[in-house]
């Protein structure tokens, strides 16, 4: 595993630089069968849509300011069994695909989803190709949360939310085999 350089710039112009050495680890393998073939190997038109949607997600993550909305910590957006873990290798209909970049929380369609920390809504999309109803919150300093496969989104881009605010409802939209929430965090 290659080392990574972390550079932090603070108020007043100070800078802290650290070299990080990630430790190798093994990830779970998750086999998911029974998906529609178009959700495993999309056609060229769908691939173009997927690229456009990925661009929207990247743009939503570019928001950077000095807010520290995560200072009070995080709460779980949904309570339910963890059915998929971050980093697990996904084998879809027998074909290896990208790792899973979130935590799957099983819950029935319509279950309330709350803001795990305060933030500003940067993306609210009702139906992305893979992730279905997709919502993103910026928590400040480049830290964001994403919530995937939503049935209903109850907030709008630009809206400020507080920790515990109702923001969405669990669904089974996009590439899924059942109702659940995927919670992702990025920095």
Descriptions of predicted regions:
Residues 1, 185-187:
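Short, intrinsically disordered, charge-balanced linker/junction segments flanking boundaries
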Residues 1-25:
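Cationic-aromatic interfacial patches
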Residues 12, 128, 167-175:
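Short, charged beta-turn/beta-strand-edge "cap" motif at the junction between a beta-strand
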Residues 12-14, 111, 141-144:
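Short acidic/polar mixed-charge low-complexity motifs
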Residues 19-131:
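Surface-exposed, glycine-biased beta-strand/turn segments
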Residues 85, 108, 124, 150-153, ...:
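Residue-level recognition of beta-strand microenvironments
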Residues 112-123, 154-170:
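Short, well-structured beta-strand-loop connectors
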Residues 116-154, 179-184:
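Zn2+-dependent peptidoglycan hydrolase active-site motif and core
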């Amino acid at each position: 595993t290659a080392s990574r350089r972390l550079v932090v710039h603070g108020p007043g112009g100070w800078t802290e630089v650290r070299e990080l050495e990630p430790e190798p680890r093994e990830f779970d393998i998750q086999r998911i069968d029974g998906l529609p073939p178009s959700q495993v190997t999309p056609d060229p038109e769908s691939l173009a849509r997927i690229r456009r949607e990925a661009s929207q997600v990247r743009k939503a993550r570019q928001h950077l300011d000095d807010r520290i909305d995560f200072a009070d910590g995080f709460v779980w957006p949904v309570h339910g069994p963890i059915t998929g873990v971050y980093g697990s290798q996904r084998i879809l209909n027998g074909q290896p695909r990208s790792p899973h970049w979130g935590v799957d929380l099983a819950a029935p369609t319509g279950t309330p989803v709350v803001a795990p920390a305060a933030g500003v809504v940067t993306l609210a999309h009702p139906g992305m190709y893979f992730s279905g109803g997709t919502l993103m919150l910026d928590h400040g300093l480049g830290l964001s949360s994403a919530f995937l496969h939503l049935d209903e989104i109850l907030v709008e881009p630009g809206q400020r939310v507080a920790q515990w605010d109702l923001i969405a409802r669990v669904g089974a939209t996009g590439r899924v085999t059942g109702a659940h929430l995927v919670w992702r965090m990025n920095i």
